[in-house]
Amino acid sequence: KIINEKILNICDNYRPNIIVLGHNNILEGSSINTIKKKYSSKFTLWYEDALGKRGEGPNWKSNLNLIEKNRHLIDSYYLTTHPDEIKTYINRKKLNFLPIPVDPNIENLEIYNCKNRFKDLFFALSHGVNFGRLKKGKNDEREEFIQKLMNMYPNIKYNILGIADENPKWNYGFFTELSKCKMSLNLSRGHPLKYTSSNRIAALVGNGIYTFIDKR
C-alpha cells in the first residue's frame, strides 16, 4: 500500500508519459488504472528470469504468474525469454524479446587485452542473484556437469566459484576472478530455449572473455 501511495504522489508531480516496471509487478491494478486515466501514461514491463514451460527453468511458473498480473493494463513487455517459448494469457502483440543488456560502464574489463591470465576456464554458480552463500543441501545439473568436466579434463586450470564449499563472489570479487582466466563457461538451468540464457552471459561476453555455452 505504501509503495502505491508513493508512486501515485510521484506521478502527480511528474505526470509521466511512460512508466517502466523493472523486473517487478507490485503495483495494484487500481493504482495503474488511476495513473493511466489521469495522465494517459503507458506502462511497460521488462523481466529477465525464466518464463518458458518447455525449458523448465527455475521458478518459471511463479515468474509467469507475476508478469501476467495486470496484463489488461500493461501496454508492452520486454522479456529475455523469447515470446515463441511463452504460453500466456497476455496478448501476444504486447510481447517483445529483450536480449540481456550489457553496460559498457560496468562490463569494461576488456579481458582480451589482459596479459596475466594464468587460469584456463572460469565458471561461477550461485543460488540466487547476489545471494552471498550457497544454500545447504541444494544442487543442480550445472554442478554435476562441472564435476564431470573436471574429472574428464584434469589438466585444465579451473577457476570455479560456487562449488565445493567455495561461496559465490559478486561485483569486484567476481570481476577480479574473471580477469584471471582465458575462457569462461555459461550454463543455464533447465533445458535450452530459443535465445534464452542465464543473465551471467552479459558479464562474460560483455567483459570480453571467450565464452562457451551449453549445447544439448
How would you describe each model-predicted region?
Residues 1-6, 14, 22-30, 54-216:
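Nucleotide-sugar donor-binding catalytic core of glycosyltransferases
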Residues 36-52:
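Active-site proximal beta-strand in glycosyltransferases
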Residues 15-16, 40-43, 182:
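Loop/turn elements at helix/coil->beta-strand transitions in domains of secreted/extracellular proteins
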